[in-house]
UniProtKB/Swiss-Prot annotation:
Xref: Pfam families: Globin
Binding, heme b: H74, H109
Protein name per its UniProtKB record: Globin CTT-Y
Signal sequence region: 1-16
Any GO molecular function: metal ion binding
Record-annotated Globin domain positions: 17-160
GO cellular component: extracellular region; hemoglobin complex
Note from the entry: There are at least 12 different components in Midge globin.
Keyword 4Fe-4S listed: no
Organism: Chironomus thummi piger
Amino acid sequence: MKVLAIFALCIIGALATPCDDFKIMQEAWNTMKNEEVEILYTVFKAYPDIQAKFPQFVGKDLETIKGTAEFAVHATRIVSFMTEVISLLGNPDNLPAIMSLLSKLGKDHKGRGITVKQFDEFHEAFHNFLHTHSVWNDNVDAAWHCNEKEIRKVINANLE
Protein backbone atom coordinates (compact mmCIF):
# COMPACT_ATOMS: atom_id res chain seq x y z
CA MET A 1 0.00 0.00 0.00
CA LYS A 2 2.85 2.37 0.83
CA VAL A 3 4.35 1.71 -2.59
CA LEU A 4 1.09 2.79 -4.25
CA ALA A 5 0.99 5.95 -2.16
CA ILE A 6 4.58 6.80 -3.09
CA PHE A 7 3.85 6.05 -6.76
CA ALA A 8 0.79 8.31 -6.65
CA LEU A 9 2.83 11.13 -5.12
CA CYS A 10 5.46 10.72 -7.86
CA ILE A 11 2.79 10.97 -10.55
CA ILE A 12 1.24 14.00 -8.86
CA GLY A 13 4.66 15.61 -8.80
CA ALA A 14 5.15 14.82 -12.47
CA LEU A 15 1.79 16.32 -13.37
CA ALA A 16 2.63 19.41 -11.35
CA THR A 17 6.00 20.25 -12.83
CA PRO A 18 6.96 19.46 -16.42
CA CYS A 19 4.22 21.11 -18.44
CA ASP A 20 3.52 24.76 -17.97
CA ASP A 21 1.60 25.53 -21.15
CA PHE A 22 -1.81 24.47 -19.87
CA LYS A 23 -3.53 27.53 -21.34
CA ILE A 24 -2.28 26.72 -24.84
CA MET A 25 -3.62 23.19 -24.52
CA GLN A 26 -6.94 24.38 -23.11
CA GLU A 27 -7.38 26.98 -25.85
CA ALA A 28 -6.75 24.40 -28.58
CA TRP A 29 -9.19 22.01 -26.92
CA ASN A 30 -11.85 24.70 -26.67
CA THR A 31 -11.79 25.18 -30.45
CA MET A 32 -12.88 21.61 -31.10
CA LYS A 33 -14.40 20.09 -27.97
CA ASN A 34 -17.91 20.47 -29.42
CA GLU A 35 -17.11 17.98 -32.19
CA GLU A 36 -17.85 14.97 -30.00
CA VAL A 37 -19.37 12.77 -32.69
CA GLU A 38 -16.54 13.47 -35.14
CA ILE A 39 -13.92 12.71 -32.49
CA LEU A 40 -15.38 9.29 -31.66
CA TYR A 41 -16.08 8.57 -35.33
CA THR A 42 -12.43 9.31 -36.17
CA VAL A 43 -11.23 6.93 -33.45
CA PHE A 44 -13.56 4.12 -34.55
CA LYS A 45 -12.73 4.66 -38.22
CA ALA A 46 -8.99 4.43 -37.56
CA TYR A 47 -9.26 1.51 -35.12
CA PRO A 48 -12.30 -0.75 -35.55
CA ASP A 49 -10.97 -2.93 -32.72
CA ILE A 50 -11.77 -0.05 -30.37
CA GLN A 51 -15.35 0.13 -31.65
CA ALA A 52 -15.60 -3.60 -30.91
CA LYS A 53 -14.93 -2.87 -27.22
CA PHE A 54 -18.16 -0.87 -26.96
CA PRO A 55 -20.98 -3.43 -26.48
CA GLN A 56 -23.64 -1.12 -27.90
CA PHE A 57 -21.64 -0.67 -31.13
CA VAL A 58 -20.21 -4.17 -31.71
CA GLY A 59 -20.79 -5.43 -35.23
CA LYS A 60 -22.64 -2.30 -36.33
CA ASP A 61 -21.84 -0.26 -39.40
CA LEU A 62 -19.95 2.86 -38.34
CA GLU A 63 -21.58 5.06 -40.97
CA THR A 64 -25.01 3.99 -39.72
CA ILE A 65 -24.39 4.44 -35.99
CA LYS A 66 -22.61 7.77 -36.42
CA GLY A 67 -25.94 9.57 -36.80
CA THR A 68 -27.69 7.93 -33.85
CA ALA A 69 -28.54 9.47 -30.51
CA GLU A 70 -26.79 6.58 -28.75
CA PHE A 71 -23.54 7.36 -30.56
CA ALA A 72 -23.84 11.08 -29.82
CA VAL A 73 -24.53 10.44 -26.13
CA HIS A 74 -21.53 8.17 -25.75
CA ALA A 75 -19.27 10.53 -27.69
CA THR A 76 -20.41 13.35 -25.41
CA ARG A 77 -19.56 11.28 -22.31
CA ILE A 78 -16.02 10.71 -23.56
CA VAL A 79 -15.43 14.31 -24.60
CA SER A 80 -17.00 15.66 -21.40
CA PHE A 81 -14.56 13.59 -19.37
CA MET A 82 -11.66 14.92 -21.42
CA THR A 83 -12.97 18.47 -21.02
CA GLU A 84 -13.16 18.04 -17.26
CA VAL A 85 -9.57 16.81 -16.99
CA ILE A 86 -8.21 19.47 -19.35
CA SER A 87 -10.03 22.24 -17.50
CA LEU A 88 -8.48 21.12 -14.19
CA LEU A 89 -4.91 21.31 -15.51
CA GLY A 90 -2.70 24.17 -14.42
CA ASN A 91 -3.87 24.49 -10.82
CA PRO A 92 -1.85 22.45 -8.30
CA ASP A 93 -4.88 22.32 -6.00
CA ASN A 94 -6.65 20.24 -8.65
CA LEU A 95 -4.01 17.51 -8.81
CA PRO A 96 -5.79 15.12 -6.41
CA ALA A 97 -8.97 15.43 -8.49
CA ILE A 98 -7.05 14.85 -11.72
CA MET A 99 -5.32 11.80 -10.23
CA SER A 100 -8.62 10.41 -9.01
CA LEU A 101 -10.33 10.88 -12.38
CA LEU A 102 -7.48 9.37 -14.39
CA SER A 103 -6.92 6.47 -12.00
CA LYS A 104 -10.62 5.60 -12.06
CA LEU A 105 -10.62 5.77 -15.86
CA GLY A 106 -7.72 3.32 -16.05
CA LYS A 107 -9.23 0.94 -13.49
CA ASP A 108 -12.68 1.01 -15.11
CA HIS A 109 -11.23 0.28 -18.53
CA LYS A 110 -8.96 -2.47 -17.21
CA GLY A 111 -12.10 -4.14 -15.88
CA ARG A 112 -13.55 -4.01 -19.39
CA GLY A 113 -10.49 -5.69 -20.90
CA ILE A 114 -9.04 -2.55 -22.48
CA THR A 115 -5.28 -2.70 -23.01
CA VAL A 116 -2.55 -0.09 -22.99
CA LYS A 117 -2.21 -0.76 -26.74
CA GLN A 118 -5.84 0.19 -27.30
CA PHE A 119 -5.44 3.36 -25.25
CA ASP A 120 -2.40 4.15 -27.40
CA GLU A 121 -4.49 3.60 -30.52
CA PHE A 122 -7.23 5.86 -29.16
CA HIS A 123 -4.61 8.49 -28.39
CA GLU A 124 -3.11 8.28 -31.87
CA ALA A 125 -6.47 8.70 -33.62
CA PHE A 126 -7.48 11.45 -31.21
CA HIS A 127 -4.19 13.27 -31.73
CA ASN A 128 -4.61 13.07 -35.50
CA PHE A 129 -8.05 14.63 -35.11
CA LEU A 130 -6.57 17.44 -33.02
CA HIS A 131 -3.98 18.20 -35.69
CA THR A 132 -6.63 18.64 -38.34
CA HIS A 133 -9.47 20.24 -36.37
CA SER A 134 -7.87 22.82 -34.10
CA VAL A 135 -5.42 25.66 -34.35
CA TRP A 136 -2.17 23.70 -34.40
CA ASN A 137 1.43 24.87 -34.27
CA ASP A 138 4.68 23.85 -32.59
CA ASN A 139 3.69 25.45 -29.26
CA VAL A 140 0.34 23.67 -29.19
CA ASP A 141 2.00 20.40 -30.17
CA ALA A 142 4.59 20.72 -27.39
CA ALA A 143 1.95 21.53 -24.78
CA TRP A 144 -0.27 18.62 -25.82
CA HIS A 145 2.63 16.19 -26.03
CA CYS A 146 3.93 17.04 -22.56
CA ASN A 147 0.54 16.97 -20.86
CA GLU A 148 -0.72 13.87 -22.65
CA LYS A 149 2.45 12.02 -21.71
CA GLU A 150 1.82 12.68 -18.02
CA ILE A 151 -1.90 11.91 -18.26
CA ARG A 152 -1.24 8.63 -20.03
CA LYS A 153 1.27 7.57 -17.37
CA VAL A 154 -1.49 7.66 -14.77
CA ILE A 155 -4.03 5.87 -16.96
CA ASN A 156 -1.54 3.23 -18.10
CA ALA A 157 -0.40 2.54 -14.53
CA ASN A 158 -3.99 1.62 -13.73
CA LEU A 159 -4.44 -0.51 -16.86
CA GLU A 160 -1.47 -2.77 -16.19
